[in-house]
Amino acid sequence: SRGLGDVYKRQVQISREKFIRKVREEFEKAGIDYTEEKVREVAEMRVRDEIKNGVQMIQYQVITLMTTNGQAPFVTVFMYLDEVPEGRTRDDLALVTEEVLKQRIQGVKNEKGVWITPAFPKLIYVLEEDNIREGSKYWELTKLAAQCTAKRMVPDYISEKIMKKLKDGNCYPCMGCRSFLTVYKDENDKPKFYGRFNQGVVTLNLVDVACSSGKDVDKFWKILDERLDLCKRALMCRHYRLKGTPSDVAPILWQNGALARLKKGETIDKLLYGGYSTISLGYAGLCECTRYMKGVSHTQPGGTEFALEVMHYLTDTCKKWAEETNIDFSLYGTPLESTTYKFALSLIHI
C-alpha cells in the first residue's frame, strides 16, 4: 500500500515550477506578450494534464505490466489529506485524489472496449475534519468519493478520529488489500508503517469448530484450543521458512529500500522479530459459527456476547503467542475468497 501524500507531497509542485519556466520560455521565443498570471494559468492546465496522465498510467500499469499469472498485484492507494502539511501541498494532494476518483468512476476498458471496474489498485479514503461536513474545505471531494463508491464499490473509508483512538494516535493504510499492521516505532521512536511486511497468514475455520462441537459450548472451547494450537504450528512453519533468508534473493526488497536496506549476504532475520513484521491468525465464519451455536446472528442479542467472547479469546491468544516468541502475531478477518469453497467442501464431511 502507498499513501498518495507520501508519494506526491513534492512532485506536483516540482512539475508546476517546471511548467512555469517552460511556458515563460515558449512565450518569449514566440515573441508573445505575457503576464505572470497568464503563465501560471497555462502552467496549471499542464499540471492537471500531467496528473491525469500519471494517474491513468499507474492504473493501467497495475492491471497490465505488473500482473503475475494473470492476477494484478494487491495494491492499495491511500487517500489521506492530513498526511501532508496544510496549504498548497494539501491542495495538490486533493487534485491528485480527485483525479484518482474520477478515473475510477470511469473505469477501465477491457479487451472488448467495455468500461469495467478494476479490482486493483484498491482505494481507501480517509474521513477527517476538513472533508466530512457540508461546507468544509474538501467536502466536494468526499461527495465525489461517495459517487465513486456507489458506482464502483470503492473507495473503502477510514475514520481518522476512530482509527487514531484505536492505533495510538496513528492513521495508516492496510498492507496489500486488507491486512493492517500493528503499531511499530523505529529507533528514533517514530511510528513506521510503509515498508513493513507480513510473514504469512493461516486461517481458522470457526464454522468447523462449531459444527465439530455439536452445539456443546464446553466442547467448542476445547476444540477451539486444539485448532489454535494447529494454527500456531502452521504459522511457525511459515516463519521458519523465512528465517535465514539472505537479502540477496530479492535485492530490491531487502537491500534497496522497498522493505529494508540490509547488507549483501545479510539475512532478513532481524526483521522477523520485535514487531517490524507481523504474522497473522486469520478467522472466518464468525456469523455462521454464532448462528450454529446460539441460533441467532452475531449481530443479535444472545449472539453478540458469544461472538465477542470468541474474538476476545482469539485476540488474547495472539498476544500470548507474541509474548512467547517475540513475533508480532495479529488477528485478521480473512477475505476467504477462493478458500470459501475449500472450507465448504470440508464441512460436508463433518
Q: What residue spans do the PLM features occupy?
A:
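Conserved catalytic cores of very large enzyme subunits
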Residues: 1-275, 292, 296-348
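Conserved phosphate/anionic-ligand binding catalytic regions in large, soluble enzymes, centered on
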Residues: 275-289
